[in-house]
């Protein structure tokens, strides 16, 4: 398929304060290691983190931003830690660099 712009007046440009989501989340099967709410939390952490992936948002704030209960933030954080994509030392989060190999494909998504 040949790609083309669908909407010319809204082309993305790299902003001065820039963060990225590593394509290895998909290609390395990381997405299968956590639930959708966990990946929503990850997206917020990637977006608000500094150049080293560090941020310190309170669970209450994260829950409000994501329309989740604080208990859901706790579970989402646990899943992301288990998936090896973040580290947490209250109140500090660190989005980690992804391992080159990723994971083998699994059948069941974490709940």
Q: Where are the predicted features?
A:
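Winged helix-turn-helix DNA-binding recognition segment
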Residues: 31, 37, 47-101
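Short, amphipathic alpha-helical interaction segments positioned at domain boundaries
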Residues: 100-111
């Amino acid at each position: 398929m040949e790609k083309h712009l669908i909407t010319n007046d809204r082309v993305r440009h790299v902003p001065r304060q820039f963060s990225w989501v590593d394509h290895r989340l998909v290609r390395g099967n990381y997405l299968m290691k956590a639930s959708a709410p966990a990946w929503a939390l990850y997206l917020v952490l990637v977006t608000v983190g500094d150049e080293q992936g560090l941020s310190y948002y309170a669970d209450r704030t994260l829950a409000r931003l994501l329309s989740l209960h604080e208990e859901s933030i706790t579970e989402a954080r646990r899943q992301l830690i288990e998936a090896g994509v973040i580290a947490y030392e209250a109140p500090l989060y660190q989005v980690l660099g992804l391992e080159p190999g990723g994971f083998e494909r699994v059948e069941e998504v974490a709940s």
